[in-house]
Amino acid sequence: NWCYDANSKFKWNVSKKSNSLKIQYNKGFDIKVPWELSRLQSLSKICVWSFLNKKKNLYTFIKNQVFDFIASNPPSYGVNWFNGMEVAIRGANLCMITDILIQENKLLPRERRIVYNSINDHMNFVINNLEWSPFSRNNHYLANIVGLLVMAYFLPRDENTLGILKFAENQ
């Protein structure tokens, strides 16, 4: 479950709009637990390790995890679409995972379209939810920009991706 804190057994509601969720602190559960899992960083590590060590038997597991995340976490709903930094990190990891799966011929054309659409959803969420302030720039904004660069560079070129790529390059 992508919205679950296994330490406290608390589950966030995936059917609530992300912008309506309230972060609660000191209640015995930690929103960062599902965020860490949902960044897909561990899946990226498994994917890179599989690629470097020619362990093709793990690609089915990796694909299943990617498609489970996409199916279980609709854009702008639930805890995993709460802020741009989390979405940007996950989007960049999806790009790396997808690139390896494509190189290894492990994605059918329809599967590739599903993942591309999800990455596009991630990119559009980030560009529409930049964590920018006129008073300071922080790690969240940096993650937003780096994620946008990776996603816009990775996706097929169109007017939207080119515009986002140009924006991110100029930050």
Model-derived segments and spans:
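N-terminal transition regions in large eukaryotic proteins
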Residues: 1-27, 32
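Aromatic-lined, polymer-binding surfaces characteristic
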Residues: 14, 24, 30-171
